[in-house]
Amino acid sequence: SQSFEESKRIIIYTGKEQNDNAVAEEENNSHTLLKVRSLSFSWNQPTNIAAFKRGKYLWIVFDRHQNLDTKELSENIAPLAKDLYQLPNPQATILRLTPGDDIKVGIRKEGLLWIVDLYTGGKSIPTREVPVFTRYDALNRAYLFAPVTDAGNIVSIFDPEIGDIISVIPFNTTNYGITMPYNYPDFDFIKTINGLVLIYKADDISITTGNSG
């Protein structure tokens, strides 16, 4: 049979999965926070979010576009983070910022409002692990399958610091991502706070999102 590395295909479906509706730590630890700064993002229709750290930067990605007041957002996150920048993209909203040392990140949702908390002290809000499986199609070609509920549109980002392409899959759930990176010859899954993020190391990789439920 053909190995996964040889097939060079990734298929990520959105399927049915039983998830917790809330992260209990979010409320239980709120009284222990020493410092907290919050970024609020209001939308008029359902929008999905991904968040991850790469190098010294924190990335926040939505799969819909909105022009943000980056000056106001920068004031909101000081002094826990700095250098907030919105990367141009007509289909998505992409923010990159530099958090301070030991800054924790949590994501909350209130209706159509997304809130990203930066904080010190207290316990980290745990990220629930996205399961990733190897499966085979009718032609016996291997692919990766992630049974994710409410995955959004794929967002491709050019990382100006490193010079490569990041493929981001935002979710409509909170604190659900990859806690340990997966490394393959042709691509990497990197650690995330929310969503899935792939780094390509080859040109012939494809991602598909769908609904198997």
Task: Please report, for each region that a protein language model flagged, where it lies by residue.
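Short linear recognition/processing motifs and adjacent strand/loop elements at protein termini
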Residues: 1-213
